[in-house]
Amino acid sequence: MKMRIQGNAIRFRLNRTEVGEFETVGKVGASIGFPGGRKLSYSLEKGGEAMGAAFDGDTIRVRVPEALAREWTGTDRVSIHEQAQGLEVIIEKDFQCLHKGEEGKDPAAYPNPMALA
């Protein structure tokens, strides 16, 4: 799962494997380790009545209501884009890169519709 933070927005991109885990388990997450043993964890979770996000000092959690999560995982819908308590939250299915280099290649990424054109 990829995370991008820009301005007052957070974006998660999930490949097919991660979307499947989110669909069946109800949660998917990742973390990055820093020197000195500290780490930042982030997760996408089903639950709540409205989309929301929380940060507790070392973990970012984004919640998606069950019905919205089911629609996103079970259809061709590419993204969820919501304002959650003043924070822009974007959840996307991750597409394969169009450039030819090895960097960023993920065999579990969704086929890029632009590559089929």
How would you label these PLM feature ranges?
Residues M1-M3, M51:
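Residue-level detector of beta-strand structural context in well-folded domains
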Residues M3-I5, I10-L14, I60-V64:
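Short, structured motif recognition centered on aromatic/hydrophobic residues
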Residues M3-R4, F12-R13, V19-F22, G26-I32:
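Acidic (E/D-rich), amphipathic helical modules within compact regulatory domains
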Residues I10, A30, D58-I60, Q85-L87:
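One face of beta-strands
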Residues E18-E21, L68-R70:
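Short, surface-exposed beta-strand-loop junctions and turns on beta-sheet-rich folds
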Residues G26-G48:
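A low-complexity, Ser/Thr/Gly/Pro-enriched, surface-exposed linker/loop concept
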Residues L40, T73-E92, C97-G104, A108-Y110, ...:
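Phosphate/adenylate-binding glycine loop and adjacent helical scaffold
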Residues E49-Q83:
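Mid-chain, well-packed structural core segment of small domains
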